[in-house]
């Protein structure tokens, strides 16, 4: 494999994999006791989600709904000088429905250029601009509640620049790469291998080349293999692994969850089999349209409503009419692309057995990287999360 070049800009979808990271962190952090509670003080965000859009009180012990955002603080954007604010572009957005009672998790990826209209002043029409225009992640939570009719209890925001540091702190993450990837001087070969920080960044950011006919949407699918590998890694975390990650979390993660809530969710996660962790994306009318010179895609109203009723309204009545914004929707359609973490795990295990004929746990190709000066996998105004 070639050697990936270091991108000139910190841009792209570096944060989606962290959806499970914070929840899983609570699991191992419980063993750290006082250290964990001290650590979470540095993660506490100043923003809180409005009580009016929370899960109804009578259901709060049965489910939790979490908005997870990867924030891109790209140089040149007009951010606040307040380091505690969530005022970057949320180039990664995932809605997580944790069925605490039924021991299931449903996660929905929302493409960063999904059209939301002008319900929040000064947006560019894309959902990833709402938190910046509205002054906080609470503005984005409100749009998701208003348009998708989904409650939001907590938020987690992650600085997108943290990916490489976290992966390298772990000494790499074992991932199944489902097909060869090559773009902009970087490449990965199909197979089960360990990705270091640079390789992981390329794997989750790339949206060009063979296998990426649908660009952003294909990239969302590829990222799930990384989530699968990361989940396996976090389930084997030791107390010392957690200790090494403490500084990273203090620097890059903000949440309105209390330490006790995070630990409780981490313990609840022990009861969730990977076969019961579902991932999907919002069904979309896929052809790009332009709104005020920004590319947008439209969430498919009926199909999205059906998806949410089946997987995200476990203990509430179905909602058949959403309030989604629309801007000249095209006839092309992309479904929710539902997959389960258990199936991804099985695919990875098969690949490992094929690569390691002796049945060992050792990965075969360790993907080494070196820094260089080259092109990013994203460019222009159509850069994706």
Named regions from a protein language model:
Residues 2-104, 301:
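Entry/capping segment at the start of metal-dependent catalytic domains
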Residues 57-62, 168-248, 253, 369-371, ...:
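Flexible, polar/acidic helix-loop-strand segments at domain edges
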Residues 61-64, 88-93, 102-110, 122, ...:
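Extracytoplasmic
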Residues 80-83, 125-134, 149-154, 209-218, ...:
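Second-shell loop/turn segments in exported
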Residues 86-90, 121, 130-138, 157-161, ...:
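Soluble non-cytosolic domains of exported or imported proteins
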Residues 90-93, 124, 137-145, 160-164, ...:
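Extracytoplasmic/secreted envelope proteins and their assembly/folding machinery
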Residues 114, 120-123, 256-385:
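C-terminal solvent-exposed extensions
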Residues 129-189, 256-258:
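Amphipathic, coiled-coil-like alpha-helical scaffolding segments used for oligomerization/assembly
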């Amino acid at each position: 494999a070639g050697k990936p070049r270091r991108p000139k800009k910190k841009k792209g979808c570096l944060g989606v994999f962290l959806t499970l990271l914070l929840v899983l962190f609570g699991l191992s952090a419980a063993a750290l006791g006082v250290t964990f509670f001290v650590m979470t003080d540095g993660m506490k965000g100043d923003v809180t989600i409005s009580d009016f859009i929370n899960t109804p009180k009578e259901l709060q012990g049965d489910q939790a709904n979490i908005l997870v955002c990867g924030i891109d603080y790209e140089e040149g954007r007009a951010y606040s000088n307040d380091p505690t604010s969530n005022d970057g572009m949320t180039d990664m957005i995932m809605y997580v429905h944790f069925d605490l009672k039924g021991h299931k998790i449903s996660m929905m990826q929302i493409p960063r250029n999904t059209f939301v209209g002008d319900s929040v002043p000064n947006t560019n029409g894309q959902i990833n601009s709402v938190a910046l225009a509205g002054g906080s992640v609470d503005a984005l939570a409100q749009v998701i509640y208003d348009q998708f009719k989904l409650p939001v209890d907590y938020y987690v925001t992650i600085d997108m620049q943290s990916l490489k540091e976290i992966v390298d702190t772990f000494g790499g993450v074992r991932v199944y790469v489902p097909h060869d990837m090559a773009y902009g001087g970087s490449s990965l070969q199909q197979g089960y291998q360990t990705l270091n920080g640079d390789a992981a960044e390329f794997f989750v950011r790339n949206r060009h080349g063979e296998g990426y006919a649908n660009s952003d949407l294909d990239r969302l699918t590829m990222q799930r293999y990384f989530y699968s590998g990361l989940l396996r890694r976090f389930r084997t975390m030791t107390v010392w692994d957690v200790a090494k990650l403490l500084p990273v979390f203090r620097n890059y993660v903000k949440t309105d969850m209390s330490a006790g809530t995070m630990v409780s969710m981490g313990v609840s996660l022990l009861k969730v089999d990977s076969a019961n962790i579902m991932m999907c994306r919002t069904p979309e009318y896929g052809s790009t349209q332009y709104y005020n010179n920004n590319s947008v895609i439209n969430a498919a109203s009926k199909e999205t409503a059906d998806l949410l009723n089946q997987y995200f309204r476990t203990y509430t009545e179905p909602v058949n009419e959403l309030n989604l914004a629309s801007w000249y929707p095209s006839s092309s359609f992309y479904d929710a692309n539902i997959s389960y973490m258990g199936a991804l795990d099985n695919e990875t295990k098969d690949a490992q057995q094929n690569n390691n004929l002796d049945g060992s746990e050792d990965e075969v190709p360790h993907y080494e990287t070196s820094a260089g000066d080259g092109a990013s996998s994203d460019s222009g105004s159509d850069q994706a999360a």
